[in-house]
């Protein structure tokens, strides 16, 4: 993590050149996931499997039933990248003296504040949100964070994305949901992208164990290119050599960009904007999201980002520019949606990897901290207000950070339960089987599932590992002829596991024995065709 976040450095008012260099180096670190996402090549939806060109087809019956049990609500996650300073966003005027004492230089003057109620205010340059609040379309959850706050940008971002704060979990909370919803996603992807992500390079929020479930572009320009032209990169002219195989692998495992290009294009061109978004970065992203929503794309989750919240120095000017962009963009976004009567169907939610320290540093800024507010927007909130207790700005933890009063996973749990009306068992999977509170956000689930799951195809399949042998175990609900084919990750056919009549009941197949030849160690994909449906999953040969 950044050196200046260590307790040994927390009292220094100025950072040394070496310390700042370490901080800058951390921001320049890229991993393989970041590199691929920066190219706009993200996702795992479409690939060549042998002679089969996999394209957008209808989801499995179970996926359809699960999808139909949901409502028509949409979530737009707005990531404030870098760690937003909550005290200068939602100002605690109930204890203005303490606030001003901690921040003699960067504080907001009382004359420059717009009161939301008697206790809390926003800076006057966020005045675009004054009407949003007044119309009952804004909630603020106080003091959001988690225990033993990690002060590294990258680790804390992963914690917010994965929900795991005590170990490194490789999947994201939305990735786990979509992995459960689309178990055969590799070969039978849904007709619409499960999620759309602009920027946030390297974020694992939509990562499953084997796929990224978001249509992801590195920036707005790439999204506009796809939306307006229907294409992004060439996937046909790939050389027939080792390099070509590697290039094909990277593009094949990231081909949702191409898979959904036409769908994105159709939705984008079917609608137009009916609000002035200005020239801000976030505003332009949200204007594109609004067109996709109004154009009937059908995607349930979007994520956009606004960067540069890491305000170690010269915070007043930088923070003002960012919060103005946020405020103006939110107002325009919901004005735009209201024209189509969709402002009550879309919930906006800000997240940030951490807050800032309660006191200013010696560079007209603030250093990495802990608790910070989460803001929610939309007519579906049924009134504006504050949720939970505000942290005591005079009571800090051992690292001089505000003590969180609400867990960020409580916010997630509340949205999943009362906005998307998901079944508790599904939410348990999403939140790694941990229990969290449900906050009073003003939203209440009004949708009950009316689907009869007794008629859903109960076919199941799973690889089982026993004594250095890999078995494919299946439960077949009704007899039928089926084929099972094994592929490597590039999509080359390795061999046929089975081509036979499967009787009703349980089946266990020894993969190595069925293939009849030596298999190299590594990951493979099997594809089952049975009863007019296709299923796939990865397995490991050890």
What does each model-identified segment do?
Residues 49-87, 95, 455, 493:
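C-terminal segment of N-terminal export signals and the immediately downstream linker at the start
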Residues 443-469, 475-477:
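Residue-level detector of functionally pivotal "anchor" positions at catalytic/ligand-binding pockets or at interdomain
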């Amino acid at each position: 993590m950044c050196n200046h976040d260590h307790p040994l450095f927390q009292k220094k008012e100025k950072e040394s050149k070496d310390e700042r260099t370490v901080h800058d180096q951390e921001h320049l670190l890229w991993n393989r996931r970041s590199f691929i996402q920066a190219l706009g090549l993200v996702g795992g939806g479409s690939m060549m499997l042998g002679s089969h060109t996999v394209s957008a087809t209808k989801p499995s019956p179970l996926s359809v039933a699960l999808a139909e049990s949901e409502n028509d609500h949409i979530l737009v996650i707005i990531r404030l990248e870098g760690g937003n300073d909550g005290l200068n966003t939602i100002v605690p005027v109930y204890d203005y003296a303490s606030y001003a004492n901690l921040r003699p230089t960067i504080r907001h003057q009382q004359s420059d504040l717009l009161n939301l109620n008697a206790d809390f205010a926003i800076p006057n340059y966020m005045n675009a949100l004054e009407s949003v609040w007044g119309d009952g379309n804004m909630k603020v959850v106080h003091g959001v964070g988690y225990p033993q706050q990690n002060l590294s940008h990258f680790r804390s971002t992963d914690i917010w994305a994965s929900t795991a704060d005590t170990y490194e979990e490789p999947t994201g909370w939305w990735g786990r949901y979509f992995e459960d919803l689309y178990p055969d996603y590799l070969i039978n992807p849904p007709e619409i992208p499960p999620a759309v992500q602009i920027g946030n390079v390297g974020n694992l929020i939509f990562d499953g164990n084997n796929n990224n479930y978001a249509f992801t572009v590195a920036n707005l320009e790439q999204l506009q290119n796809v939306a307006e032209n229907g294409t992004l990169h060439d996937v046909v002219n790939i050389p027939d050599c080792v390099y070509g195989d590697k290039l094909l692998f990277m593009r094949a495992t990231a081909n949702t960009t191409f898979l959904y290009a036409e769908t994105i294009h159709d939705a984008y061109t079917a609608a137009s904007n009916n609000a002035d978004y200005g020239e801000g970065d976030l505003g332009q992203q949200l204007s594109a999201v609004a067109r996709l929503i109004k154009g009937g794309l059908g995607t349930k989750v979007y994520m956009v980002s606004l960067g540069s919240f890491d305000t170690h120095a010269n915070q007043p000017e930088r923070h003002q520019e960012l919060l103005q962009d946020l405020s103006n963009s939110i107002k325009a976004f919901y004005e735009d949606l209201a024209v189509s009567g969709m402002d009550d169907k879309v919930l906006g939610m800000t997240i940030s990897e951490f807050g800032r320290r309660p006191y200013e540093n010696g560079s007209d800024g603030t250093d990495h901290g802990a608790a910070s507010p989460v803001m929610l927007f939309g007519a579906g909130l049924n009134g504006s207000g504050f949720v939970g207790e505000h942290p005591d700005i005079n009571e800090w933890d051992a690292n001089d950070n505000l003590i969180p009063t609400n867990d960020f996973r409580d916010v997630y749990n509340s949205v999943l339960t009362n906005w998307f009306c998901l079944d508790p068992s599904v939410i348990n999977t999403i939140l790694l089987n941990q229990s969290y509170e449900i906050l009073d956000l003003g939203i209440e689930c009004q949708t009950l599932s009316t689907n009869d799951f007794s008629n859903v195809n109960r076919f199941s399949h799973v690889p089982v590992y026993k004594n250095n042998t890999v078995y494919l175990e299946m439960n077949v609900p009704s007899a039928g002829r089926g084929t099972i084919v094994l592929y490597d990750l590039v999509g080359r056919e390795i061999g046929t596991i089975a081509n036979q009549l499967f009787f009703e009941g349980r089946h266990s197949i020894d993969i190595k024995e069925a293939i009849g030849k030596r298999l190299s160690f590594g990951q493979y994909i099997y594809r089952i065709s049975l009863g007019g449906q296709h299923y796939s999953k990865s397995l490991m040969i050890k």
